[in-house]
């Protein structure tokens, strides 16, 4: 139900095929704007689009909310959480998940940013920490709640670091006037030698300059090997 699945389903319109889309959610998520949900800039409904509404005029389209548990290619069959289904052609467009590079500890403790629910988890954690920090008795306790580390200098990492810096600069002074925004520190850690490695060097340079001007602490050529609370 991601970009690949939707594009194929649309391309098969009037092809004579019966198209069955299987997804664990009954809506499509728009990944490029998930970071806006995490920062409370957008509500989840703004980037979530129900499959049935998208394809409601298609008589050749069927949707089933389920998870695929097993594939039996010799039988042209899949086993899902709601039962079995036969197919003539099977297309796997499951999307991606966060890569923790085998570090189970970080996987357990970190907050990934691939889905709307994960973005909401980050949003709720941030807002809860803001509220808790107001009642802390010492500056050190406040800082422990307000330090945010973003690992990965790709598009998502740069975007979330950017909106967090905007929250620090514009939201905190207005919504939390009794808490100095200077206590919030944002770190962006990238294992490579530049941000946005998949884009042009000019884009990387502008992104780094903007984030530094916004107060983000950028650490390049640094790998995160573990996490300790």
Regions found by a protein language model. Give the residues of each.
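Short secondary-structure capping/turn micro-motifs that flank functional sites
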Residues: 28, 227-228
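FAD-binding core/adjacent interface of flavoenzyme oxidoreductases
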Residues: 61-149
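A conserved beta-strand/loop element that lines the FAD pocket in flavoprotein oxidoreductases
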Residues: 57-72, 212-227
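Beta1-alpha1 glycine-rich phosphate/pyrophosphate-binding loop at the start
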Residues: 1-62, 69, 155-199
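Predominantly flavin-linked oxidoreductase catalytic cores and closely associated redox partners
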Residues: 112-113, 117-210, 214, 218-220
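Glycine-rich, flexible loop/turn motifs
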Residues: 30-34, 38, 97-102, 106-112, ...
